[in-house]
Regions:
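Gly/Ser/Thr-enriched, mixed-charge loops and adjacent short helices
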Residues: 108-199
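Short C-terminal domain-edge/linker segments immediately following a structured domain
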Residues: 33-35, 74-76, 126-131
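Ferredoxin-reductase
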Residues: 38-118
Length: 199
């Protein structure tokens, strides 16, 4: 059973969080976008460092492309706020992040964002859940990821610099430099690693 809560749809990998259910969610969202006329504007898709997150994001995007939605694929694991920022920065109607946030390692999930990079409300997620649960897996249209890239349906993006610049613009970096503090940081295999290397 697919059900979006306040933090998105989260479930145990291999139980409710399966490839077929991921594809159903993608198809339900894609068809909503087609009905709204926002399919050509596109969607930003990102993923964290959890087990299977990149693969899940690929499965999701293959359906979006197959259903006729343009995809901007963040081609490097990233923090959830980076996808939210990118939805706003690129003026996109939707974004998704493959993550289960703070849940145990056996979970994964999908967070949905709407225009402005906001968390999707129940007005969006309830109809998507309902449609996804009613879909027959065989009715879902899938386009191979590499084929979709070649066809321009999926485009790789790296919004890291724009995201980090937006954060650093709010920080007095010179004051930090003048203090020359010693900082010990352990990203704990988390998604902050790529941003920290960039900074």
């Amino acid at each position: 059973m697919i059900h979006f809560g306040t933090g998105g749809w989260r479930a145990v990998i291999g139980d409710d969080f399966t490839k077929a259910n991921v594809q159903r969610v993608a198809a339900a969202l894609a068809r909503r976008m087609v009905r709204e006329g926002s399919a050509d504007q596109g969607i930003c898709a990102g993923y964290d460092r959890r087990f299977l997150s990149r693969e899940v994001c690929i499965w999701f995007c293959e359906v979006m492309a197959g259903e006729g939605v343009k995809v901007y694929f963040v081609n490097l694991n990233c923090p959830t706020p980076q996808v939210m920022f990118t939805v706003k920065h690129m003026n996109l109607p939707y974004g998704i992040m493959v993550t289960a946030s703070h849940n145990p390692a056996i979970y994964n999930g999908i967070k949905l964002f709407t225009f402005g990079g906001r968390d999707a409300t129940e007005d969006y997620t309830d109809p998507i859940s309902e449609e996804a649960n009613s879909l027959d897996a065989d009715s879902v249209r899938v386009m191979d990821f590499e084929h979709a890239r070649e066809a321009g349906k999926i485009e790789f993006i790296d919004p890291r610099d724009a995201y980090l610049d937006s954060i650093l613009a709010q920080v007095d970096v010179d004051a930090i430099r003048r203090r020359r503090p010693r900082i010990v940081l352990d990203p704990m295999f988390g998604v902050s690693l790529n941003g920290l290397i960039t900074i």
